[in-house]
Amino acid sequence: MIPRYSRPEMVAIWSPETKFRIWFEIEAYAGEALAELGVIPKEAAKTIWEKGDAAKFDVARIDEIEAVTKHDVIAFLTHLAEFIGPDSRFVHQGMTSSDVLDTTLNVQLVRAADLLLADMDRVLAALKKRAFEHKDTVRIGRSHGIHAEPTTMGLTFARFYAEMERNRARLVAARAEIATGAVSGAVGTFANIDPRVEEYVCEKLGLEAEPVSTQVIPRDRHAMFFATLGVIASSIENVAIEIRHMQRTEVLEAEEFFSPGQKGSSAMPHKRNPVLTENLTGLARLVRMSVVPAMENVALWHERDISHSSVERAIGPDTTITLDFALNRLAGVVEKLVIYPENMLKNMNKFRGLVHSQRVLLALTQAGVSREDSYRLVQRNAMKVWEQGADFLEELLGDAEVRAALSEEQIREKFDLGYHTKHVDTIFKRVFG
């Protein structure tokens, strides 16, 4: 991912230096286990650890060797041998390249998941804070983009919080799904390496041993992981789209923080655009791009092929780096989001009471009018508001058929905003406990 949408904490997980360090640790831990089993000398295992641990792996040198070998793991092992010396013959005993590559990828994905979980905690904290801050800030709810009935800004934040909380649980499950390693040798049969080596290496790396690998770790695990990241990205976009609509000039119920010195347009000095949430909408697309390729990686030939490899070399870093950046950007947007309660009330009153139409409809049915006739009466008066700019309450009070069923007091009572928010505390208790 380009530096513009990257944070150093996540980039470091995918650096060549980090990758080669994990490669070395897998080889060194395997050497320790093999030494305990009497397969290689204990002094050799000690030498591998000491000399390899002190080495500063030269990425350029490894690339130079790979240019000849056309094999990245062999290039690394050749470079490692330059540090270790004669005992390097005991490195990679009974192992295959996938033991190193697949286990390393999963270590990196686990570390990435841990960072993403911390990011989500920041987003959740921001959403919760703003939810309680605006628990009773009334705004119009919209369906199909059209005024529906009153809700509160706090409930808007609360539903995003609940969605992100579900996503966090999904990511915890996806992390567990991906936290496996394999050191099972060619075609995964342990023919030339003891299963206890795999168990030891995985324990040291904080992984579970893959129950059955076929030289590679099954890619359904990775498919679930990246699918989860795609869902999280969609939830980010869900929040971003809401904010973008709320910042429209004719709505202006909320606005991204506009910092001193910020410019909105090279041509129009007056512009204050929702650029951060627009950016988040685009970044969500990039994250979701990884989902289908990850699923297509599940079907491999027989015990293995490398059709998955080129895909994962790209989507592993790009997707996690992008999502990490997006989550932190979203948290910042929510934390600094400017809310305009007065505009919310102004917008809600724009159609002069139409938002109370359902209450009038229900009152008529409860007064003995058929649902069909009740709907006709309410809609007839509502259309006068839409088409003539009339006042809904006044039209109802002047409608003889409506007044035959409902008194003035009964009609006026149906225009109480508090009626629509009376269960906000109940919903908050469900969401926040």
Where are these regions (language model features)?
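Conserved helix-loop functional segments at active or binding sites
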Residues: 133-136, 170-173, 177, 207-211, ...
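Catalytic-core signal marking the mid-to-C-terminal active-site face
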Residues: 1-18, 55, 66-68, 75, ...
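Short, well-ordered beta-strand elements within core beta-sheets of diverse protein domains
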Residues: 155, 223-231, 359-367
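A helix-coil-helix interface module used to build multimeric assemblies
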Residues: 1-184, 190, 194-200, 209, ...
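Short amphipathic alpha-helical segments with heptad-repeat character
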Residues: 110-121, 128, 158-161, 165, ...
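Acidic, glycine-rich loop-and-beta core segments that form the ion-binding/anion-interacting portion
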Residues: 198-291
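Generic, well-ordered alpha-helical scaffold segments in large soluble proteins
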Residues: 33, 79, 83, 126, ...
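A structural signal for small-residue-enriched, beta-sheet-centric alpha/beta enzyme cores
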Residues: 189, 204, 209-216, 345, ...
